[in-house]
């Protein structure tokens, strides 16, 4: 990106002066997202340092945090998806969706859950720094999983397997969820693994307003990361405005 950015600037703006640099920044802000703008500004600034014109360095643009959650699966779609999967006899995927929505697991964590963890009722995870995080499996989910496993005559090993009997991959889960979204007429933009983690957090705060506990359950280093779940989705904001603003 560094060479491409500098080459583009030289081709289109030629001289490195205040006027041209601000014109270039304006162009970036009009056509690109803030993160991309900042990456290109960073490249230009490095070149300015290199040619001894560091006084002309451009300032980065401020990335505004959105005031709403994006692409979060609704409770209605979550319930509908589970219902359809169960109805069609796709029990493993019924449980994949249920576990994602009821444990707050990241997909990389979900694929590591073993039958032994189901029987225990939790799965202990350790971060790179050795910090412990416990992923709890709710009682109802645990009991239903045990019934399913009994029918499948499985007593040990990874909970979710692929068609070869090996541990399923995170990529495999993402792709299959997209396939089911298409099959059942759901928006594939919201039917992806992390969307269910967002749903878990939102539902948790609505039933138990303990943000510190949720931060621990989610494995967030900072409670500020968890605060985003206090926000509503864009759809919820629109619905609320439609009800409130009648003047």
Regions found by a protein language model. Give the residues of each.
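Conserved catalytic core of the tyrosine transesterase superfamily
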Residues: 1-247
């Amino acid at each position: 990106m560094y060479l491409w950015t500098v080459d583009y600037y030289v081709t289109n703006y030629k001289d490195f002066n205040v006027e041209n640099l601000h014109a270039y920044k304006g162009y970036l802000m009009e056509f690109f997202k803030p993160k991309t703008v900042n990456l290109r500004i960073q490249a230009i600034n490095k070149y300015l340092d290199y040619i001894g014109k560091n006084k002309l360095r451009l300032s980065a643009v401020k990335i505004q945090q959105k005031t709403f959650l994006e692409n979060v699966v609704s409770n209605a779609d979550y319930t509908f998806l589970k219902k359809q999967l169960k109805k069609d006899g796709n029990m493993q995927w019924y449980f994949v969706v249920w576990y994602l929505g009821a444990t707050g697991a990241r997909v990389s964590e979900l694929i590591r859950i073993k039958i032994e963890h189901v029987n225990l009722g939790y799965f202990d995870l350790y971060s790179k720094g050795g910090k412990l995080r416990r992923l709890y499996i709710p009682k109802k989910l645990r009991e239903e999983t045990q019934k399913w496993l009994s029918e499948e005559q499985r007593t040990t090993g990874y909970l979710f397997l692929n068609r070869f009997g090996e541990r399923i991959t995170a990529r495999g889960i993402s792709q299959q969820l997209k396939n089911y979204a298409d099959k059942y007429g759901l928006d594939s933009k919201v039917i992806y693994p992390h969307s269910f983690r967002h749903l878990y957090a939102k539902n948790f705060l609505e039933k138990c307003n303990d943000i510190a506990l949720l931060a621990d359950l989610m494995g967030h280093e900072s409670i500020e990361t968890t605060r985003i779940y206090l926000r509503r989705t864009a759809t919820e904001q629109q619905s609320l405005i439609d009800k409130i603003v009648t003047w």
